[in-house]
Design a protein with these regions (language model features):
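N-terminal maturation segment of proteins
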Residues: 1-304
Length: 304
Protein backbone atom coordinates (compact mmCIF):
# COMPACT_ATOMS: atom_id res chain seq x y z
CA UNK A 1 0.00 0.00 0.00
CA UNK A 2 2.93 2.37 0.53
CA UNK A 3 3.74 2.64 -3.20
CA UNK A 4 0.11 3.64 -3.80
CA UNK A 5 0.34 6.13 -0.94
CA UNK A 6 3.43 7.74 -2.47
CA UNK A 7 1.70 7.96 -5.84
CA UNK A 8 -1.36 9.58 -4.27
CA UNK A 9 0.85 12.10 -2.47
CA UNK A 10 2.45 13.14 -5.74
CA UNK A 11 -0.97 13.53 -7.33
CA UNK A 12 -2.41 15.56 -4.44
CA UNK A 13 0.48 17.92 -3.74
CA UNK A 14 0.85 21.21 -5.59
CA UNK A 15 4.58 22.01 -5.21
CA UNK A 16 3.96 25.74 -5.62
CA UNK A 17 1.94 25.75 -2.37
CA UNK A 18 4.55 23.87 -0.32
CA UNK A 19 6.92 25.94 1.88
CA UNK A 20 10.55 25.45 0.90
CA UNK A 21 11.67 24.36 4.36
CA UNK A 22 8.91 21.71 4.51
CA UNK A 23 9.94 20.32 1.13
CA UNK A 24 13.62 20.14 2.06
CA UNK A 25 12.82 18.41 5.36
CA UNK A 26 10.67 15.66 3.83
CA UNK A 27 13.26 15.13 1.09
CA UNK A 28 15.84 14.37 3.79
CA UNK A 29 13.44 12.14 5.75
CA UNK A 30 12.11 9.99 2.91
CA UNK A 31 14.93 7.43 2.78
CA UNK A 32 14.33 6.70 6.45
CA UNK A 33 11.36 4.54 5.43
CA UNK A 34 13.85 1.97 4.12
CA UNK A 35 15.88 2.11 7.33
CA UNK A 36 12.81 0.85 9.21
CA UNK A 37 12.67 -2.19 6.93
CA UNK A 38 16.40 -2.80 7.30
CA UNK A 39 16.30 -2.43 11.08
CA UNK A 40 13.12 -4.27 12.00
CA UNK A 41 11.91 -6.48 9.14
CA UNK A 42 14.91 -7.87 7.26
CA UNK A 43 16.66 -9.18 10.42
CA UNK A 44 13.56 -11.31 11.07
CA UNK A 45 12.88 -12.34 7.48
CA UNK A 46 14.41 -15.76 8.13
CA UNK A 47 11.38 -16.66 10.23
CA UNK A 48 9.40 -16.97 6.99
CA UNK A 49 9.74 -19.80 4.50
CA UNK A 50 8.51 -20.68 1.03
CA UNK A 51 5.81 -18.51 -0.52
CA UNK A 52 5.56 -16.29 2.57
CA UNK A 53 9.24 -15.36 2.28
CA UNK A 54 8.88 -14.75 -1.46
CA UNK A 55 5.96 -12.39 -0.87
CA UNK A 56 7.93 -10.50 1.78
CA UNK A 57 10.98 -10.17 -0.47
CA UNK A 58 8.80 -8.95 -3.33
CA UNK A 59 7.10 -6.41 -1.06
CA UNK A 60 10.45 -5.09 0.18
CA UNK A 61 11.79 -4.80 -3.36
CA UNK A 62 8.62 -3.00 -4.42
CA UNK A 63 8.98 -0.61 -1.50
CA UNK A 64 12.61 0.14 -2.37
CA UNK A 65 11.61 1.05 -5.91
CA UNK A 66 8.70 3.18 -4.68
CA UNK A 67 10.89 5.07 -2.19
CA UNK A 68 13.53 5.68 -4.88
CA UNK A 69 10.86 6.91 -7.32
CA UNK A 70 9.40 9.20 -4.66
CA UNK A 71 12.86 10.50 -3.73
CA UNK A 72 13.46 11.43 -7.36
CA UNK A 73 10.19 13.39 -7.41
CA UNK A 74 11.04 15.09 -4.12
CA UNK A 75 14.50 16.14 -5.31
CA UNK A 76 13.67 17.06 -8.90
CA UNK A 77 10.09 18.34 -8.67
CA UNK A 78 8.98 19.26 -5.16
CA UNK A 79 12.06 20.98 -3.72
CA UNK A 80 12.92 23.10 -6.80
CA UNK A 81 9.31 24.25 -7.20
CA UNK A 82 8.36 24.75 -3.55
CA UNK A 83 7.23 28.38 -3.34
CA UNK A 84 4.68 28.32 -0.52
CA UNK A 85 4.66 30.43 2.63
CA UNK A 86 4.46 28.61 5.96
CA UNK A 87 2.76 31.67 7.47
CA UNK A 88 -1.02 31.28 7.56
CA UNK A 89 -1.82 34.95 8.15
CA UNK A 90 -3.18 36.94 11.09
CA UNK A 91 -6.86 35.99 10.78
CA UNK A 92 -6.35 32.24 10.51
CA UNK A 93 -3.62 32.31 13.14
CA UNK A 94 -5.86 34.05 15.68
CA UNK A 95 -8.61 31.49 15.09
CA UNK A 96 -6.15 28.62 15.38
CA UNK A 97 -4.64 30.11 18.55
CA UNK A 98 -8.01 30.31 20.29
CA UNK A 99 -8.83 26.69 19.46
CA UNK A 100 -5.36 25.49 20.42
CA UNK A 101 -5.28 27.26 23.79
CA UNK A 102 -9.00 26.89 24.51
CA UNK A 103 -8.69 30.45 25.77
CA UNK A 104 -9.63 33.95 24.70
CA UNK A 105 -6.11 35.25 25.41
CA UNK A 106 -4.99 37.40 22.50
CA UNK A 107 -1.58 37.42 20.88
CA UNK A 108 -0.84 40.79 22.47
CA UNK A 109 -1.72 39.53 25.95
CA UNK A 110 0.44 36.44 25.49
CA UNK A 111 3.30 38.59 24.21
CA UNK A 112 3.05 40.93 27.22
CA UNK A 113 3.14 37.98 29.61
CA UNK A 114 6.08 36.47 27.77
CA UNK A 115 8.06 39.72 27.78
CA UNK A 116 7.47 40.14 31.51
CA UNK A 117 8.62 36.55 32.05
CA UNK A 118 11.80 37.18 30.06
CA UNK A 119 12.66 40.08 32.38
CA UNK A 120 11.98 37.95 35.47
CA UNK A 121 13.97 34.95 34.23
CA UNK A 122 16.93 37.06 33.18
CA UNK A 123 16.95 38.55 36.67
CA UNK A 124 17.20 35.02 38.08
CA UNK A 125 19.92 34.16 35.57
CA UNK A 126 21.95 37.18 36.67
CA UNK A 127 21.55 36.23 40.32
CA UNK A 128 22.85 32.71 39.63
CA UNK A 129 25.62 34.10 37.42
CA UNK A 130 26.88 36.24 40.31
CA UNK A 131 26.95 33.18 42.56
CA UNK A 132 29.01 31.04 40.17
CA UNK A 133 31.32 33.80 38.89
CA UNK A 134 32.21 35.59 42.13
CA UNK A 135 35.88 35.01 42.91
CA UNK A 136 36.71 33.53 39.51
CA UNK A 137 39.59 34.93 37.47
CA UNK A 138 38.57 37.21 34.62
CA UNK A 139 35.00 37.42 35.89
CA UNK A 140 33.05 40.40 34.50
CA UNK A 141 31.65 43.17 36.65
CA UNK A 142 28.92 41.87 38.97
CA UNK A 143 27.20 44.92 40.53
CA UNK A 144 24.07 44.67 42.67
CA UNK A 145 22.08 46.68 40.15
CA UNK A 146 23.55 45.99 36.71
CA UNK A 147 22.72 47.83 33.52
CA UNK A 148 21.62 45.78 30.51
CA UNK A 149 25.14 45.37 29.15
CA UNK A 150 26.56 44.24 32.52
CA UNK A 151 23.72 41.78 33.00
CA UNK A 152 24.21 40.33 29.52
CA UNK A 153 27.97 39.98 29.93
CA UNK A 154 27.61 38.18 33.27
CA UNK A 155 24.96 35.79 31.93
CA UNK A 156 27.10 34.97 28.89
CA UNK A 157 30.13 34.27 31.09
CA UNK A 158 28.12 31.92 33.32
CA UNK A 159 26.61 30.15 30.32
CA UNK A 160 30.11 29.50 28.99
CA UNK A 161 30.73 27.38 32.09
CA UNK A 162 27.63 25.32 31.29
CA UNK A 163 28.57 25.03 27.61
CA UNK A 164 31.97 23.60 28.56
CA UNK A 165 30.34 20.66 30.37
CA UNK A 166 29.13 18.76 27.32
CA UNK A 167 29.05 15.12 26.22
CA UNK A 168 31.19 13.74 23.43
CA UNK A 169 29.75 13.45 19.95
CA UNK A 170 28.82 9.78 20.35
CA UNK A 171 27.70 10.00 24.00
CA UNK A 172 24.48 12.02 23.75
CA UNK A 173 22.20 8.98 24.07
CA UNK A 174 24.21 7.51 26.96
CA UNK A 175 24.04 10.88 28.72
CA UNK A 176 20.28 10.94 28.22
CA UNK A 177 20.01 7.46 29.77
CA UNK A 178 21.99 8.59 32.81
CA UNK A 179 19.93 11.74 33.27
CA UNK A 180 16.66 9.79 32.94
CA UNK A 181 17.77 7.38 35.67
CA UNK A 182 18.75 10.30 37.91
CA UNK A 183 15.48 12.15 37.32
CA UNK A 184 13.44 9.01 38.03
CA UNK A 185 15.31 8.32 41.26
CA UNK A 186 14.95 11.97 42.34
CA UNK A 187 11.19 11.93 41.71
CA UNK A 188 10.87 8.76 43.80
CA UNK A 189 13.09 9.96 46.64
CA UNK A 190 11.26 13.28 46.93
CA UNK A 191 7.87 11.57 46.52
CA UNK A 192 6.94 14.21 43.95
CA UNK A 193 4.44 12.08 42.07
CA UNK A 194 3.48 8.43 41.62
CA UNK A 195 6.06 6.98 39.23
CA UNK A 196 4.50 4.45 36.83
CA UNK A 197 6.02 1.05 36.14
CA UNK A 198 5.35 1.32 32.40
CA UNK A 199 8.49 0.50 30.39
CA UNK A 200 10.36 3.41 28.80
CA UNK A 201 13.26 3.07 26.39
CA UNK A 202 15.65 5.66 24.98
CA UNK A 203 16.23 5.12 21.26
CA UNK A 204 17.89 6.81 18.33
CA UNK A 205 15.23 8.78 16.51
CA UNK A 206 14.11 6.94 13.35
CA UNK A 207 15.66 8.52 10.29
CA UNK A 208 12.33 9.42 8.70
CA UNK A 209 11.45 11.59 11.72
CA UNK A 210 14.71 13.52 12.03
CA UNK A 211 15.23 17.12 11.05
CA UNK A 212 12.48 18.75 13.11
CA UNK A 213 13.09 18.22 16.83
CA UNK A 214 16.10 17.06 18.83
CA UNK A 215 13.94 14.71 20.89
CA UNK A 216 10.38 13.54 21.38
CA UNK A 217 8.34 11.20 23.57
CA UNK A 218 6.27 8.53 21.80
CA UNK A 219 3.78 7.14 24.32
CA UNK A 220 1.48 4.17 23.65
CA UNK A 221 -2.17 5.09 23.35
CA UNK A 222 -4.90 4.15 25.84
CA UNK A 223 -5.79 1.06 23.77
CA UNK A 224 -2.17 -0.14 23.52
CA UNK A 225 -1.71 -1.98 26.78
CA UNK A 226 1.72 -3.03 27.99
CA UNK A 227 3.72 -1.35 25.24
CA UNK A 228 6.85 0.73 25.73
CA UNK A 229 7.17 4.48 25.72
CA UNK A 230 10.01 5.61 23.47
CA UNK A 231 12.11 8.64 24.35
CA UNK A 232 13.77 9.32 21.01
CA UNK A 233 16.99 11.31 20.59
CA UNK A 234 18.17 12.55 17.21
CA UNK A 235 21.84 11.66 16.63
CA UNK A 236 24.30 14.23 15.35
CA UNK A 237 24.31 13.93 11.53
CA UNK A 238 27.37 12.11 10.15
CA UNK A 239 28.05 14.89 7.65
CA UNK A 240 28.27 17.64 10.26
CA UNK A 241 31.62 19.39 10.63
CA UNK A 242 33.42 19.62 13.96
CA UNK A 243 32.29 23.25 14.16
CA UNK A 244 28.62 22.31 13.69
CA UNK A 245 28.92 19.48 16.19
CA UNK A 246 30.57 21.67 18.81
CA UNK A 247 27.86 24.33 18.37
CA UNK A 248 25.16 21.70 18.87
CA UNK A 249 26.81 20.19 21.95
CA UNK A 250 27.37 23.60 23.50
CA UNK A 251 23.61 24.11 23.39
CA UNK A 252 22.70 20.53 24.30
CA UNK A 253 25.26 20.36 27.07
CA UNK A 254 24.98 18.05 30.07
CA UNK A 255 22.63 20.39 31.94
CA UNK A 256 20.43 20.84 28.89
CA UNK A 257 20.19 17.06 28.42
CA UNK A 258 19.08 16.83 32.06
CA UNK A 259 16.34 19.32 31.21
CA UNK A 260 15.47 17.39 28.05
CA UNK A 261 15.03 14.15 30.01
CA UNK A 262 12.86 15.90 32.58
CA UNK A 263 10.65 17.42 29.87
CA UNK A 264 10.36 14.42 27.56
CA UNK A 265 10.34 11.64 30.12
CA UNK A 266 10.46 11.98 33.90
CA UNK A 267 8.34 13.51 35.24
CA UNK A 268 7.27 15.11 31.95
CA UNK A 269 5.66 13.57 28.87
CA UNK A 270 6.34 9.91 29.69
CA UNK A 271 4.76 10.15 33.13
CA UNK A 272 1.82 12.29 31.97
CA UNK A 273 1.16 9.95 29.06
CA UNK A 274 1.21 6.87 31.29
CA UNK A 275 -1.29 8.38 33.72
CA UNK A 276 -3.47 9.69 30.88
CA UNK A 277 -3.70 6.21 29.33
CA UNK A 278 -4.89 4.84 32.68
CA UNK A 279 -7.86 7.21 32.92
CA UNK A 280 -11.17 5.32 33.35
CA UNK A 281 -12.64 7.20 30.38
CA UNK A 282 -11.23 5.80 27.13
CA UNK A 283 -12.57 8.82 25.28
CA UNK A 284 -10.66 11.19 27.53
CA UNK A 285 -7.56 9.05 27.15
CA UNK A 286 -7.83 9.16 23.36
CA UNK A 287 -8.58 12.90 23.19
CA UNK A 288 -5.57 14.07 25.19
CA UNK A 289 -4.92 17.79 25.50
CA UNK A 290 -1.73 18.73 23.73
CA UNK A 291 -1.70 22.06 25.55
CA UNK A 292 -1.90 20.33 28.92
CA UNK A 293 0.79 17.82 27.93
CA UNK A 294 3.24 20.58 26.98
CA UNK A 295 2.25 22.75 29.92
CA UNK A 296 2.84 19.85 32.30
CA UNK A 297 6.25 19.06 30.80
CA UNK A 298 7.41 22.68 31.10
CA UNK A 299 5.99 22.92 34.63
CA UNK A 300 7.99 19.86 35.71
CA UNK A 301 11.20 21.53 34.53
CA UNK A 302 10.60 24.19 37.19
CA UNK A 303 9.54 21.66 39.83
CA UNK A 304 12.67 19.57 39.38
Amino acid sequence: KLPALFAQMRENIDPARVPKTHAETVARQNSGVISLVEQFIEPNAGLLQGDDRKRLDAAIEGLRKAVAEHQLWLDKTLVPNAKGDFRIGQKLYDEKLEYALMSSLSRDEIKQRAEAEVVRVRGEMYKISRQVLTGKANAPELPDSPNDAQQQKAIEAALELAYADKPKRDAVVDTAKQTLAQATEFARQKDLVTVPDDPVEIILMPEFQRGVAVAYCDSPGPLDKGLKTYYAISPIPDDWTDKQTDSFLREYNTRMIHLLSIHEAMPGHYLEGAHSARHPSTLRGVLRSGMFAEGWAVYTETVM
